[in-house]
């Protein structure tokens, strides 16, 4: 991906985040890193990878979230964004692509 695409999202609780696509090769590497020996993605690893490589503003880590639901909402939206999967929760709270 020559121009790393960004997207602004707004969570259900009103917090705004900027996501940035890290490139196709990095997405493939992330997908490999987050799986356990049985090929099942680890929630903790997915969150760590999304927060390290995709959520660019504000920079966050797992410990910054007060609720599991809020943390997973951001991580899931980031994962949907980089993999090109439609967000099943997509509604008027999502920002527009930039």
Residue ranges and their predicted role:
Residues 5-14:
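Short acidic-hydrophobic surface loop/beta-edge motif
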């Amino acid at each position: 991906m020559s121009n790393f695409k960004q997207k602004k999202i707004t969570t259900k609780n009103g917090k705004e985040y900027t996501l940035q696509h890290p490139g196709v090769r990095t997405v493939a590497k992330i997908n490999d890193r987050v799986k356990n020996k049985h090929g099942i993605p680890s929630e903790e690893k997915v969150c760590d990878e999304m927060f390290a490589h995709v959520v660019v503003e504000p920079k966050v880590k797992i410990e910054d979230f007060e609720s599991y639901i809020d943390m997973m909402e951001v991580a899931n939206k980031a994962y949907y964004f980089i993999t090109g999967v439609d967000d099943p929760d997509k509604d008027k709270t999502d920002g527009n692509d930039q």
